[in-house]
From Swiss-Prot:
Keywords: Aminoacyl-tRNA synthetase, ATP-binding, Cytoplasm, Ligase, Nucleotide-binding, Protein biosynthesis. GO terms for cellular component: cytoplasm. The gene is aspS. The record marks H30, G81 as: Important for tRNA non-discrimination. CDD domains: AspRS_core (cd00777), EcAspRS_like_N (cd04317). Aspartyl-tRNA synthetase with relaxed tRNA specificity since it is able to aspartylate not only its cognate tRNA(Asp) but also tRNA(Asn). Reaction proceeds in two steps: L-aspartate is first activated by ATP to form Asp-AMP and then transferred to the acceptor end of tRNA(Asp/Asn). This is Aspartate--tRNA(Asp/Asn) ligase. InterPro entries: Aa-tRNA-synt_II, aa-tRNA-synth_II, aa-tRNA-synth_II/BPL/LPL, Asp-tRNA-ligase_1, Asp-tRNA-ligase_1_N, Asp/Asn-tRNA-synth_IIb, AspRS_core, GAD-like_sf. It is found in: Cytoplasm. Homodimer. Residues 196-199 are annotated as: Aspartate.
Amino acid sequence: MRTHYCGAVTAADVGNTVTLCGWAHRRRDHGGVIFIDLRDREGMVQVVVDPDTPAAFKLAEDVRAEFVLKIEGKVRPRPAGTENPHLPTGMVEVLTLDLDVLNPSLTPPFQIDDETINENIRLQYRYLDLRREPMQKNLKLRYRVSKIMRDYLDTHGFMEVETPMLTRSTPEGARDYLVPSRVHDGMFYALPQSPQLFKQLLMVSGVDRYFQITKCFRDEDLRADRQPEFTQVDLETSFMGEEAIMGLVEGMIRDMMQKAQGIELPAAFPRMSYAEAMNRYGSDKPDLRVTLEIVDVGDVMRDVAFKVFATPANDPKGRVAALRIPGGATLSRSEIDGYTEFVKIYGAKGLAYIKVNDVGQLNEAGLQSPIVKNLSEAALHAVMERTGAQNGDLIFFGADRAKVVNDALGALRLKIGHEKGHVDGRAWAPLWVVDFPMFEYNEDENRWDALHHPFTAPKDGHEDWLATDPGKCLSKAYDMVLNGWEVGGGSVRIHREKVQEKVFAALNIGEEERREKFGFLLDALQYGAPPHGGLAFGLDRLVTLMAGAESIRDVIAFPKTQRASCLMTNAPNVVDEKQLRELHIRLRNPIAADKAA
């Protein structure tokens, strides 16, 4: 139907006849000549319809926004002074010879180029929202990113293998989406949270190098960077250790970002242990572009009169830490109050601070704060020395359980760093976070939980602690972090059945439960399972970062809202009683039951 995309018409086509198809973006009537900006996925070109083609002119008079048009015309230079250097096609226009309205359009609920549209309206009319240039760019970038990674993995000997979407429910840290079985009364499938166990079984099968770009599902509370269904670039390989796997996927990300957007990442990503990341940045996914750092001061606060500091300083699970803000003494009282309210989101009870007016006077004459009188000179000296405080700085303090302090000061570090310009100017700051603990203690249930998942291998020499002191065990896990986002995570897996049994025991998973939920894996590990490991990248997160999008929803064609609903199709929805009977399901909620009747 067409010879060219609208956005592909250039000065090289001057004098040629072209056929274009697209949407009427804008129509203007100037002194008896009609101008139509015709748009398709590749861009826009100006079309001119004059009375010398009366049939086309008559049709053009009735054209409105978003009509679908087919236009045959001759490419000519724009008249001098009317060129548009901001448009790739801005040096030419198409003089219409023939016009056909392929389909009219209702008046759209918003202008396609309106950047202030309410997101709910955008999601309700997603098929119109996707016509907008930013959304088209995001979809193209997403496709290019996935294609480059697929090509890279193919070049490195990986084979794409599909794994099941209907599987069994196994605990992986979030709630499963359950699918009732019609033929197995009272039984359910689960949609996979990841292909984790299947890709390990593929390694046992001798596939050697596997990858898949696949949908995963988690029934969890949503945030800006989460969706109930999301896309993973998933890979697994046999006979490779941590360093080899990290090197391979680091090369993939470097290759992809260079080819997709011309971004040059460093030749080798820095490495940082989990413990160091938490200590210095309060997060296991630190944004290294922010120059502010958290400093421990708990050891010098154990004997101070200020109980807010002394109590957590003497608690093995507590932490007292400081965050220096260069030039922060100029912060107003209202700004400090705002930051105090901000950290309360993360469980902090408040936010103590000291304004440094004269670092040489370790008393109320040189340090402005109601807490100074309750701190010893030795403690104040240690704080000033460790933080590197200078005159005009401000020091914030966190004092609570270690998790609260890390969460609160870690978030505050990012907020102030970006708001006040405490960044180093880099556009991209990748790193690997390594040496994660195997387990974290669940105080509510008085048990150990796997920090990543229960199939992660312990560090060499740590296996013996699984039974005696699980908290000391470190794992062969690694996360790739980019600008404060975890874009990928993986590990070397357990390939020996006896070690897997020990990990299940440390997690208080009894023998009967192990066999019921993971018997197939334990059996497979006894049939010559090779050493193996892998990693999964969140494609949605990665593209969001690269696109500079505000939300992950902006890089997904048909996303769900933060309430896990689709405003366009009204999913989820009720189903009729006949369908429920076939699935052997009766609704206990009377409202839902009435709707289904």
